Amino acid sequence: MDAYQQYIHKSRYARYLPEEKRRETWEETVDRYVDYWGSNLPSLEKQRVRKAIYDMDVMPSMRALMTAGEALDRDNVAGFNCSYLPIDHPKAFDEMMYVLMCGTGVGFSVERQYVQKLPEVAETFHETDTVINVADSKIGWAKSFRE
């Protein structure tokens, strides 16, 4: 691995190991990824996949490489590089916010056949004393956006 690749790995994909007070090595990151996804692979196939990633002959989803383990167990959205949704319902906005907060890119369509399904936006707004309480979590922020 050259210096640039090492920097990218350490700064983006290597987990911090608190008990060892350091970040993962490339080999440890690959092991974490392969161990996470490889439980259904025969041993020989798992070894081949591990070697191919170690040697950088192939690259898995980098989002999944970053999040494999507890983070991906908590929320599988974090394993995707990108997603898509049409903007055809108000709920699309909070869904988009949630997916973005998980670190996944979102492509969207605002084509006529989709946006014509949205409710009209009022031309004027009235004063309100409404308070929106936001739970400090990805889900909390997305739900508050819906309010």
Where are these regions (language model features)?
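Extended catalytic cores of very large enzyme megasubunits
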Residues: M1-E147
